[in-house]
Design a protein with these regions (language model features):
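Catalytic nucleophile-His microenvironment captured as a short glycine-rich beta-strand/loop
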Residues: 144-171
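A short, polar/proline- and glycine-enriched secondary-structure boundary/capping micro-motif
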Residues: 178-186
Length: 216
């Protein structure tokens, strides 16, 4: 694809978009280090820049209804990552525990080149905090990724990690909260994680999110 044919389109956070008209419709690409990536089909894009907290709040607005909206944590984490990329989406009402067979670790296939890292949580709280934080901070300010947790009781969960300055921020888009990392570490047996903001998405990601509908 010859990028010189495309005009610079909208700007969302740090992501530039290129576009051209195909069969009367605008098609968009994300410019990543001068390499154009075609945008995912059938997903709308945000019309304005939103804060991280605003994007998190939009991911799973039906959480209070219970049911599937409390069993879709992977969809919620994915929706947050897509919203930070400029997509106007929310989590699909899919029981992602069933959709992924409830297994950990698992390569979800939402990203090209995803590589799952594992962190066995030490029993010493202070050591656990330092060791995991050091692992995440090495990715650098502004980086973002998926965190999957195997709790000590055998259950699992999915959330988002971000690096903000010299701090690790853990977001739970399923219930719209910023999490105390030390609490997660105390309750967890194993963390599985990988960085997402530097990876390209696959079409499979569209199966677990839907276009945002503020009227729901």
């Amino acid at each position: 694809m010859d990028e010189r044919k495309y005009k610079v389109g909208d700007l969302y956070e740090r992501n530039h978009f290129r576009r051209r008209k195909i069969n009367g419709e605008w098609r968009y690409w994300r410019d990543d280090n001068n390499r154009a990536e075609e945008m995912l089909p059938n997903l709308k894009r945000k019309t304005s820049i939103m804060t991280p907290n605003g994007d998190m709040a939009a991911c799973n607005r039906q959480y209070s209804k219970g049911g599937v909206y409390r069993n879709n944590c992977i969809s919620c984490a994915l929706a947050y990552d897509l919203r930070r990329r400029g997509y106007d989406v929310e989590a699909a009402p899919i029981d992602t525990t069933s959709a992924t067979n409830g297994s950990l670790p698992i390569q979800l296939g939402f990203y090209k080149g995803e590589k799952l890292e594992m962190f066995e949580v030490p029993s010493d709280d202070e050591a656990a905090m330092k060791q995991f934080s050091d692992r995440i901070l090495k990715y650098g300010d502004g980086s973002r990724g998926l965190l999957r947790i195997r709790w000590k009781n055998g259950d699992g969960h999915a959330a988002i990690w971000e690096v903000s300055g010299d701090a690790v921020v853990i977001r739970d888009p399923q219930n719209n909260t910023i999490v105390d990392l030390s609490d997660y570490l105390r309750r967890a047996k194993t963390f599985y994680y990988f960085r997402t903001d530097n990876l390209k998405l696959t079409d499979k990601a569209t199966e677990f999110v839907r276009n945002y509908n503020g009227g729901d």
